[in-house]
């Protein structure tokens, strides 16, 4: 739904929109099949999810720490376990059986904050790179009018 009120998470990297929500929580959403198999989104609030998108919520540890741990550990697990059918997919046990080391809260927070800082900086640098590319294209067009 183009002007839907709530994000609708599918196996794509970016959510679509929908008019109804099924969840009102803080969650990690993991693509369970297709080209983006294992892609992890984080969301807090009201949303809906496609049937092949795993919704992980109600964490007793730092959810951001878990997100970063999954970004490292899940691709390795997927490489071993994914189905090689026409559409690759994972099953719930792929996630449930994953062993994530859980350090103390202080270390979890430190790791999560550090990774979020790197992610923000990377995002800023990518945006700056995009601006430089646009400026370069503009200047080239001006030079060859």
What are these model-derived regions, one by one?
Residues 60-61, 105:
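Short, surface-exposed acidic/glycine-rich loop or hinge patches that mediate macromolecular interfaces
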Residues 1-4, 82-83:
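Short coil/turn segments at secondary-structure boundaries
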Residues 47-53, 83-106:
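A short glycine-rich beta-alpha junction/loop motif
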Residues 99-145:
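Amphipathic alpha-helical coiled-coil/heptad-repeat segments
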Residues 65-66, 111:
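Hydrophobic side chains in well-ordered alpha-helices
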């Amino acid at each position: 739904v183009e002007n839907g009120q709530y994000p609708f998470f599918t196996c794509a990297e970016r959510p679509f929109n929908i008019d109804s929500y099924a969840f009102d929580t803080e969650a990690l959403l993991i693509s369970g099949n297709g080209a983006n198999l294992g892609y992890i989104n984080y969301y807090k609030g009201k949303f809906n999810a496609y049937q092949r998108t795993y919704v992980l919520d109600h964490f007793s540890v730092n959810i951001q720490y878990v997100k970063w741990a999954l970004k490292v550990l899940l691709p390795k697990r997927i490489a071993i376990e994914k189905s090689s059918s026409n559409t690759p997919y994972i099953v719930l046990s792929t996630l449930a059986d994953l062993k994530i080391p859980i350090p103390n809260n202080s270390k979890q927070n430190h790791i999560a904050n550090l990774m979020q800082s790197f992610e923000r900086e990377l995002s800023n640098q990518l945006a700056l790179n995009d601006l430089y590319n646009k400026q370069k294209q503009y200047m080239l067009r001006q030079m060859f009018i």
